[in-house]
């Protein structure tokens, strides 16, 4: 049933299309054969890279729709064009933090009344499991929960895509903070380095998102991205890199209390980052719960040949 449904063309609007994950979702939707629309907000007029991205989307076959979060009716008109809305609004402290702006999108979808599914901006840790998260990083999860509650209160059909660390931020650097490149000599290991973590290439996250958005099996469900070969400990990730380079790194184990020391004195974005790293690498928040095959992306869509972390790390050689 799911397979036949996904061969049909679905009209999709991507909001936040020029963002880090948004641009990948646009391309994945086009590759999946969806009739893809992207929301162009008037304020991007002087941002040359975003303008060029929109032009590249247009060249690939996407349709540009103008709309503004300060103009409710323009949002209603935009969502009336499509069956599915996917949001990729930024929700991290070191970039723009726009999670609650999605409430305006919820209102527009509610008024339009035609949208068959909404995928809000998620893609990371599962917010209902993060009520205990350290501030200020918890703000992201609290706000995502606020958006979820608004979606469900409005009776809008949904799919939540969660569960993985973006490889570019967590794998290429062997999970080191303050760099996106692999360390050359020394590597910090969180605790004993044996907590299981989920890594995923961002293009694969986008592919799974494009496949799940019209799949009846995932309607009103949470889809976890947990590709089995990419469920690794930090030590296993480091060992993959050491095998590729033929060089052993000097390892320094950092106890939890040392990792969190002086967090209150740090800048807010750094505090949030420390908190997220703590929950992932010390608590194991991505893997401390079971996920059924009908809830896991790589099981639902085995045709996606996801990138393993050894292949991912080869890019840095």
From Swiss-Prot:
The active site is at residue 144. It is an enzyme of class 1 (oxidoreductase). Keywords: NADP, Oxidoreductase. (-)-pinoresinol binds at residues 125, 177-178. Disruption phenotype: No significant difference in lariciresinol content. Prr1 and prr2 double mutants show a complete inhibition of lariciresinol biosynthesis. Elevated levels of pinoresinol, reduced lignin content in the fiber cells, and a slightly altered lignin structure with low abundance of cinnamyl alcohol end groups. NADP(+) binds at residues 18, 20-21, 41, 50, 90-91, 95, 98, 121-122, 144, 166. Its EC number is 1.23.1.1, 1.23.1.3. GO terms for biological process: lignan biosynthetic process. InterPro entries: NAD(P)-bd_dom_sf (IPR036291), NmrA-like (IPR008030), NmrA-type/Isoflavone_red_sf (IPR050608), PCBER-like (IPR045312). It catalyses: (-)-lariciresinol + NADP(+) = (-)-pinoresinol + NADPH + H(+); (+)-lariciresinol + NADP(+) = (+)-pinoresinol + NADPH + H(+). Gene3D superfamilies: NAD(P)-binding Rossmann-like Domain, UDP-galactose 4-epimerase, domain 1. Expressed in roots and stems. GO terms for molecular function: pinoresinol reductase activity. Transmembrane segments: none annotated. The keyword Isomerase does not apply. The keyword Oxidoreductase applies. Signal peptide: none annotated. Reductase involved in lignan biosynthesis. Involved in secondary cell wall biosynthesis in fiber cells. Unlike conventional pinoresinol reductases that can reduce both pinoresinol and lariciresinol, PRR1 shows a strict substrate preference toward pinoresinol. Active on both (+) and (-)-pinoresinol. Abstracts the 4R-hydride from the NADPH cofactor during catalysis. Belongs to the NmrA-type oxidoreductase family. Isoflavone reductase subfamily. Forms homodimers. This is Pinoresinol reductase 1. It comes from Arabidopsis thaliana (Mouse-ear cress). The gene is PRR1.
